[in-house]
A protein has these predicted regions:
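Helicase-associated low-complexity/disordered flanking segments
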Residues: 1-40, 44-48, 256-284
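Conserved P-loop/Walker A NTP-binding site and adjacent catalytic elements of P-loop NTPases
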Residues: 21-23, 29-205, 212, 230-235, ...
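Conserved C-terminal RecA-like helicase domain
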Residues: 79, 87, 94-103, 238-313, ...
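Conserved two-lobed SF2 helicase motor
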Residues: 114-129, 285-296, 306-325
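Conserved interdomain hinge at the start of the Helicase C-terminal
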Residues: 212-236, 243, 300-308
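Non-catalytic terminal extensions of ATP-dependent helicases
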Residues: 288, 307-308, 393-394, 398-798
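Conserved segment of the helicase C-terminal RecA-like domain
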Residues: 330-333, 337-339, 345-386
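Compact beta-sheet-dominated globular domain cores
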Residues: 802-837
Length: 837
């Protein structure tokens, strides 16, 4: 029986409250006072701003709100900041209200979009609000994690629905809202409903606070001995979190029995990357690492071990994700300052409370603990003074260590101030874009009036409003000049005085805003060109969001190689530094793509919000014939391999969906298959999540996660595996062409081909030829011979060298071990010979 079966015959507020609270009681849930107050206001039709601590049951209030909307025959929207949380909430609400009554919109996928309960990201709701405004069929909006309203890049999406949906009842929820008086008055004015602010400083699990001047290992040992684990140690960079985990390996965290339980739960889990091998050591010792740069499967494993109570310590960052379910008894701050991208500053009250609030698990703990470490130099000084004892002479002789130059200090006073401070008021992040104007113009009615109201009656200060008005006028003029909008002599049947001359693709700005540009750019490429497949990849890559960490690493690598070459050429330092400014990461087809984009933008001005960005991540990986591990090692990205994987998965989805089937040549199909299989073998969860969002009726989120841990054999995808084999062989050709015999030896020492063996073989080749080709023809299928021998579980392969004379009598022979390849998720081969046929 679902919650929808509990709906009373009529929507009387008292009957609704009684029905929902009776259902909760039947589930063994006793409502907290704040929950009761919020639900009474919701069923009465008021807007509710719910500001209660973490673990105080805001999700139950949200369920009660949806229940109320359904009773009133209204469409109710639930919004969350990330797609994973939207997906999780979708399945939760399906259990409560039945799958036929719940839908999901994420920009990537649309499921049961006409359902009365819709889960979506804030951007999706903002898009609907801009397009339909007061005519949207939305009776209620539940906005979770509302503090995202103040996010610099995304906060606009939390504001737009408040401005444009006056017909809706709003329930705004967060643990760290601060002063909300502006929202209270503004919502009441816009919606005509009363707005109730429900606050509670009382946590289900009370927190105690302590500031310590002991070294962190001593602090941690005491926390473990006093049963205050699990401890979440807060760091402010991913590197610090990993370094801390390594430094704690000397502390004995777990008993033998506990380590056996950890090993049992890990089971056959594959730690496939360099970081993964280190993580395996940490978690088996009872230490977790958790940050956004990790592969999703590693984060999920850490969460699984933590939920089972097997991890004593988790080393993570201050960005402990929204919706991440990691049980924590103690939060240990290593510092009370952070670098925010511009400067080092003291934590804001909201940042502090957002992390500190994770301590103490409702239903498990009777208390939570928040501990802050003093700065290291203060700790060392305290230690030296303690060693001197009470002897005044010895204490005077103690040489106090000074803080590092430029150090931003904190103290117990800082800690106490943060504890006692309310979160800062939320700052408006309103912005004007092409898509905003186009959406408003597409609406029925007077677009000028609607836009004027949006620009002058938002949450921005007047000075900022004037800036937005100037921006809107400039965009409107560009739309007129481009012929995208036209002014009408008299209003049309729907009251428009201006109208679009093009069809506005629904949701085009939410997922791949430049996908239509890519379709147009494909026509500029020559299908007969040897580089056609890679050029198609470059077009698609130019439409994707920039993975900043990857591109920075690629630029550093390019500059490092350039410096080495310039030094060898005897170029002076000043000139070297000047030349370095012109060196960036690879940008294939840059001139062609920018010219095409500027032409396309004239007739499709909304793409002006999303400039084209040429880059070469997939292409570089393919041209260098690198595996995922080799790529992250080559560019020193092991600590951010999760970001690399997310980009690869996004690129695979874009290639697969954006390129029409009739443009997918054999080479391009091979490349797409290779990329998809590589992503799946490293960590299939991102692709599984995507497929599951598109087909949620097939499996639940939990089943999708289990599936992600059960990797399919890499040899099962024959097309992709052939490309993996081809790349593995061609990687050796590229290294041989550069005469990098040391690296070849590192690859093949186990099969008897060490540096000396490779050097001897290649010396004979260089005696005969001056060059070894590595162009498109050199890596083509004609120069790779494959003999499949499934009976013996192997393939025999021969990579023929592209010598300058075209003799094609030299090459590399190898055997591919199919079972070992399935075990490791890559092409495992053993070189058998290098030389002439």
């Amino acid at each position: 029986m679902t919650l929808i079966d509990q709906l009373p015959p009529d929507a009387d507020p008292d009957a609704l409250f009684e029905a929902f609270s009776s259902w909760a009681e039947g589930q063994g849930i006793t409502l907290y006072p704040a929950q009761e107050e919020a639900l009474i206001e919701v069923v009465s039709g008021a807007n509710v701003i719910l500001s209660t601590p973490t673990g105080s049951g805001k999700s139950l209030v949200a369920a009660g709100a949806h229940f109320t909307a359904l009773a009133n025959d209204q469409v109710t929207f639930y919004t969350a900041p990330i797609k994973a949380l939207v997906s999780e909430k979708f399945f939760d609400l399906c259990k409560l209200f039945g799958t036929e009554n719940v839908g999901m919109l994420t920009g990537d996928a649309s499921v049961n979009a006409d359902a009365p309960v819709i889960c979506c990201t804030a951007e999706v709701l903002a898009s609907i609000a801009l397009r339909d405004g007061k005519h949207a069929d939305i009776g209620q909006v539940v906005m979770d994690e509302f503090h995202f309203y103040a996010e610099p890049d995304r906060g606009w999406a939390w504001q737009i629905p408040l401005l444009e949906l006056p017909q809706a009842q709003f329930i705004l929820m967060s643990a760290t809202l601060g002063d909300v008086s502006m929202f209270e008055k503004d919502l009441t004015r816009r919606t005509g409903r009363e707005t109730s602010v429900v606050r509670s400083a009382t946590r289900p699990v009370p927190l105690s606070y302590e500031y310590v001047t002991t070294p962190i290992t001593e602090t941690l040992t005491e926390l473990l001995e006093t049963r205050q684990a699990p401890v979440y140690i807060v760091h402010f960079t991913q590197a610090q979190a990993v370094e801390r985990a390594q430094s704690l390996m000397s502390i004995n965290m777990c008993s033998r029995e506990e380590k056996d339980k950890i090993a049992e739960l890990i089971g056959n889990f594959r730690f496939t990357t360099k970081f993964g091998q280190n993580l395996s050591r940490y978690v088996r010792h009872g230490i977790g690492v958790h940050h956004a740069g990790m592969l999703p499967k590693y984060r999920r494993l850490v969460e699984k071990l933590a939920q089972a109570g097997l991890l004593k310590v988790i080393c993570g960052t201050d960005t402990l994700g929204v919706g991440v379910n990691v049980p924590i008894r103690t939060v240990l701050f290593t510092a009370l300052t952070k670098y925010d991208g511009n400067r080092v500053r003291t934590l804001r009250a909201r940042e502090f409370h957002q992390i500190a609030g994770r301590a103490g698990r409702a239903g498990f703990d009777t208390a939570g603990f928040v501990v802050a470490q003093a700065p290291e130099h203060v700790i060392e000084n305290e230690k030296a003074l303690a060693k001197a004892g009470d002897d005044p002479k010895k204490r005077r002789k103690v040489v106090r260590k000074k803080a590092p130059e430029g150090f931003v200090a904190w103290s117990d006073t800082t800690f106490e101030k943060l504890i006692g401070s309310e979160p800062e008021p939320l700052t408006s992040r309103f912005r004007v874009t092409n898509i905003m104007l186009l959406s408003v113009i597409a609406r029925p009615g007077n677009a000028f009036e609607a836009m004027r109201r949006l620009l002058e009656d938002n949450h921005e200060p007047r000075k900022a409003q004037l800036r937005h008005i100037r921006r809107a006028i400039a965009i409107y003029r560009s739309l007129l000049d481009g012929g995208v909008v036209e002014q009408l002599d008299k209003p049309d049947a729907e009251g428009r005085t201006i109208r679009l001359t093009v069809d506005l693709q629904q949701d085009f700005a939410l997922n791949q805003p430049l996908s239509t540009f890519a379709l147009a750019a494909f026509d500029l490429l020559d299908p007969e060109s040897p580089s056609y497949a890679l050029d198609m990849v470059s077009v698609v890559e130019s439409t994707l969001d920039d993975p900043r960490q990857i591109l920075a690493a690629m630029q550093n690598k390019a500059r490092g190689e350039a410096v080495g070459q310039m030094k060898a050429d005897g170029i002076e330092y000043e000139e070297r530094m000047e030349r370095l400014q012109d060196i960036s990461y690879p940008k294939p087809l840059e001139e062609l793509l920018w010219h095409a984009y500027n032409v396309y933008k004239k007739s499709h001005p909304w793409v002006g919000d999303h400039p084209v960005s040429p880059k070469s991540v997939i292409r570089d990986m393919y041209e260098r014939a690198l595996t995922f591990t080799e790529f992250t090692s080559w560019y020193e990205l092991a600590r951010t391999e999760g970001i690399v994987l997310r980009y690869l998965a996004s690129a695979y989805k874009a290639l697969d969906h954006t390129i029409p089937d009739d443009l997918k040549t054999e080479d391009l199909q091979d490349l797409i298959a290779w990329l998809g299989e590589m992503v799946r073998q490293v960590d299939s969860s991102l692709l599984d999540e995507w497929e599951q969002l598109a087909n949620p009726e097939i499996e639940t989120a939990e089943q999708a996660q289990e599936k992600a841990d059960q990797v399919k054999p890499v040899t099962a995808n024959a097309r992709a595996f052939r490309v993996l084999v081809r790349n593995a062989m061609f990687r050796r050709v590229e290294l041989a062409a550069l005469d990098h015999v040391r690296e070849l030896g590192e690859l093949d020492a186990e099969s008897g081909w060490d540096e000396d063996a490779w050097g001897e073989a290649m010396d004979k080749y260089w005696d005969e030829y001056e060059d070894l080709g590595t162009g498109p023809d050199a890596r083509g299928p004609k120069l790779l011979l494959i003999e499949e021998d499934p009976e013996h579980g192997l393939w025999r392969v021969r990579q023929i060298f592209a010598d300058p004379n075209g003799d094609h009598d030299w090459g590399i022979s190898a055997e591919v071990d199919l079972a070992a390849s399935d075990e490791e998720g890559r092409a495992v081969l053993r070189v058998t010979s290098v030389g002439q046929l």
